[in-house]
Amino acid sequence: MEEAMSTKEKILDAALTLFAENGYNGTSVEQIARIVGIKAPSLYKHYKGKEDILNALIDSSEARHEETFGSEEHIGKIPESIEEFVKVTMGRISFTMRDPAIRKIRKFLVQEQFRNKRISEVTTMHQLDGIQGMFAKIIKGMMEKGIVKEDDPALLSAELTAPAVLQIARADRQPQYLEESLENIEKHIRHFCKVYMKDSE
């Protein structure tokens, strides 16, 4: 059983690499099997076909992303201070920008978002609805604690997250700007805190 699970994981890892490099349509089951070191017929013991691999890959990536970054349903602990908010937010963003598997899946999602309905929905969730919904809840929780000034949490969330999404996209396109993008994101977050959060001193 362990060997079967290990092979399934290897198949997903190989598929992610090939999908990110060549696109979904540019990748064959035979190519995936070759990287894993198995024959194509053996791959069908684990997955029904390429679409099944794609769905399993999205499912596993979404579960990992939710566990490490969070989601609208799992926002984590509400920060108790400005510094805690900056630290936790930058930790989440740094993870999603540095993790090789997350970067590969994001690259693949961006490439395939116009060709696959599910991928389009997942991309919109990560770049817009999901991330803004999550931070709207965090900001609302901080308003209730008296840390954030009273305002529309959804609008503040959009103002907070939109520049970060643009910087992440830039770093994905041009990896040489990764550190600069992280610095710009932190500067924006601190400016956001200066404008909308109450000085705790």
How would you label these PLM feature ranges?
Residues 98-100, 104, 110, 117-144, ...:
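Amphipathic alpha-helical packing segments from all-alpha helical-bundle domains
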Residues 10, 14, 18-60:
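Helix-turn-helix
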Residues 1-6, 201:
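N-terminal intrinsically disordered/low-complexity leader segments
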Residues 90-98, 106-114, 192-196:
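Helix-loop "lid/cap" segments that line or gate small-molecule binding pockets
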Residues 121, 125, 139-191:
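Hydrophobic/aromatic-rich alpha-helical bundle segments in the mid-to-C-terminal region
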Residues 50, 57, 61, 65, ...:
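Hydrophobic/aromatic residues within well-ordered alpha-helical segments
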Residues 56, 70-103, 154-160, 186, ...:
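Hydrophobic alpha-helical connector segments
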Residues 61, 65-69, 117, 164-175, ...:
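Short amphipathic alpha-helical interaction/hinge segments
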